[in-house]
């Protein structure tokens, strides 16, 4: 068994990827790269806007900047290696590189799942207790929310990385995925993985199902508060406050829960790859668009930034 572990450590793995070199797949690969570029630029721009514009220094935008940072790190962890392997035709990844990719991926997905869940509490307080919002969502609370999201996500990532890399791998080293995804990697292990499967399921319940339950409970309370609002303008503002977050939640949790919480007998590598593309590339692109295009404050900050650049260039 040790011989196989050493061989895996030395030789690494092969990522079979999601694209072939057919004409159709070349078009799809180009589309993914466009999405990656938009995600990269959109999240970087949103982080800078929130940092530079004093009008966006509020709890909601602080959480949004952290969400954009997570999305930015997530796409940079997955897409560049996938693109390099596709363009070079090598498809290889080292054992250490695979472990690092797993650690970052699990940490970031877990952190984002928790942060989206805790952001629902922020929306609940904003709608249901607007007068107490500055007290209930003070700076210390905001730092605790983001800090706990990052901390638990990183702990989850380290646990799964150590557990996955500690298994013996023998026979085929071909991972049927476009990155080192834990469940695809486990299929190559020549040891009983039932304990790891249980650990993975427990982590998914804590990082996905529990925050999703918090979100549903928060929005049930928000709905009750909205129904009690008699002013049409206030009712519209309350819905606008929550709609962006609810859209992001649906996109992220829909794909992630489909990926990790459905029974194994319904799993197929092709389905897993498509679901992974959705929440590792598409969602990070859509989040900044959802929060900026539908938000007057962000668009206003962008216009002010462009005006400053234009005035500066004239001088």
UniProtKB/Swiss-Prot annotation:
- What is this entry's stated membrane topology? Multi-pass membrane protein
Q: Name one GO cellular component term.
A: plasma membrane
Q: What disulfide bonds does the UniProt entry report for this chain? A: 98-180
Q: Which CDD domains match?
A: 7tmA_OR2T-like
Q: Which residues cross the membrane?
A: 32-52, 59-79, 100-120, 150-170, 199-219, 239-259, 273-293
Cell compartment(s), UniProt: Cell membrane
Q: Which domain of life is it from?
A: Eukaryota
Q: Which residues lie on this side of the membrane: Extracellular?
A: 1-31, 80-99, 171-198, 260-272
Annotated signal peptide: none
Glycosylation: residue positions: 6
The UniProt keyword set, sorted, is: Cell membrane, Disulfide bond, G-protein coupled receptor, Glycoprotein, Membrane, Olfaction, Receptor, Sensory transduction, Transducer, Transmembrane, Transmembrane helix
Q: What does this protein do?
A: Odorant receptor.
Any idea what this protein is called?
A: Olfactory receptor 2V1
Q: Which gene encodes it?
A: OR2V1
């Amino acid at each position: 068994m040790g011989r196989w572990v050493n061989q895996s450590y030395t030789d690494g793995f092969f990522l079979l990827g999601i694209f072939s070199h057919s004409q159709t797949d070349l078009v799809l690969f180009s589309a993914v790269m466009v999405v990656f570029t938009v995600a990269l630029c959109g999240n970087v721009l949103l982080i800078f806007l929130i940092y530079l514009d004093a009008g966006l220094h509020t709890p909601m935008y602080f959480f949004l900047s952290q969400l954009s940072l997570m999305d930015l790190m997530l796409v940079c962890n997955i897409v560049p290696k996938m693109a390099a392997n596709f363009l070079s035709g090598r498809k290889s990844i080292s054992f250490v590189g695979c472990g690092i990719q797993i650690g970052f991926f699990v940490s970031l997905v877990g952190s984002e799942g928790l942060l989206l869940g805790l952001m629902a509490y922020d929306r609940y307080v904003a709608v249901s207790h607007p007068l107490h919002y500055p007290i209930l969502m003070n700076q210390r609370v905001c730092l605790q929310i983001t800090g706990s999201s990052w901390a638990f996500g990183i702990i989850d990532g380290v646990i799964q990385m150590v557990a996955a890399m500690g298994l013996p791998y023998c026979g085929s080293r071909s991972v049927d995925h476009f990155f080192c995804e834990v469940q695809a990697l486990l299929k190559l292990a020549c040891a009983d993985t039932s304990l790891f499967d249980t650990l993975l399921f427990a982590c998914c319940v804590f990082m996905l199902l529990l925050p999703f339950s918090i979100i549903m409970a928060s929005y049930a309370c928000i709905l009750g508060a909205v129904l009690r609002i008699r002013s049409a303008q206030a009712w519209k503002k309350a819905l606008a406050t929550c709609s962006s977050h609810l859209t992001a939640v649906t996109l992220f949790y829909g794909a992630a829960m489909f990926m990790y919480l459905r029974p194994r007998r319904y799993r197929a590598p092709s389905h897993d790859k498509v679901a992974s593309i959705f929440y590792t590339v598409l969602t990070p692109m859509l989040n900044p668009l959802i929060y900026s295009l539908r938000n007057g404050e962000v668009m206003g900050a962008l216009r002010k930034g462009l005006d400053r650049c234009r005035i500066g260039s004239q001088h």
